[in-house]
Amino acid sequence: MAVEHNMQSSTIVDVLEKILDKGVVIAGDITVGIADVELLTIKIRLIVASVDKAKEIGMDWWENDPYLSSKGANNKALEEENKMLHERLKTLEEKIETKR
């Protein structure tokens, strides 16, 4: 009688699909020191996930980054316009005060 083994194999595509679907967080610290004197500490925090999963957990920084998104560039233009309008308002208020 032959014994059957249920061998499941995963391809790299299957593994990547699971990782992107669920997400993976990798955290680590690297410390360089001499004689109990800490010279350098590097904190590494890495998340690997699909865009949908990242948005689901609240990570959407790339949507407003002016270097990565047209929305971000629009926000930069709005900030500049807002700053200019504040300066203009301040100038007008000062002119009104001097006329009193």
UniProtKB/Swiss-Prot annotation:
Q: Which InterPro entries match?
A: Gas-vesicle_GvpA-like, GvpA, GvpA-like_CS
- What is the protein's major site of localization? other
List locations, semicolon-separated: Gas vesicle
UniProt-recorded Gene Ontology molecular function terms: structural molecule activity
At the top level, the lineage of the source is Bacteria
Q: Which UniProt keywords apply?
A: Gas vesicle
Entry keyword Cell inner membrane: no
**Matching Pfam families, A to Z?**
Gas_vesicle
What Gene Ontology terms describe where this protein resides (cellular component)? gas vesicle; vesicle membrane
- Applied use: The minimal pNL29 gvp locus overexpressed in E.coli can be filled with Xe and used as a contrast agent for ultrasound and magnetic resonance imaging. Engineered gas vesicles (GV) can be used for noninvasive imaging in E.coli and mice. Heterologous GVs with 2 copies of gvpA plus gvpC from D.flosaquae and the gvpR-gvpU operon from this bacterium make GVs suitable for imaging of bacteria deep in mouse tissues (e.g. the gastrointestinal tract), or when expressed in tumor-homing bacteria, can be detected in tumors.
Family per similarity comment: Belongs to the gas vesicle GvpA family.
Q: What is the documented function of this protein?
A: A minor component of the gas vesicle, might be involved in nucleating gas vesicle formation. This protein could be important for the shape determination of the gas vesicle. Gas vesicles (GV) are hollow, gas filled proteinaceous nanostructures. During planktonic growth they allow positioning of the organism at a favorable depth for light or nutrient acquisition. When a minimal gvp locus (gvpA2-gvpR-gvpN-gvpF-gvpG-gvpL-gvpS-gvpK-gvpJ-gvpT-gvpU, called pNL29) is expressed in E.coli gas vesicles are made.
State how it assembles: Interacts with GvpA.
Q: What is this protein called?
A: Gas vesicle protein J
**Organism the protein comes from:** Priestia megaterium
Q: Which gene encodes it?
A: gvpJ
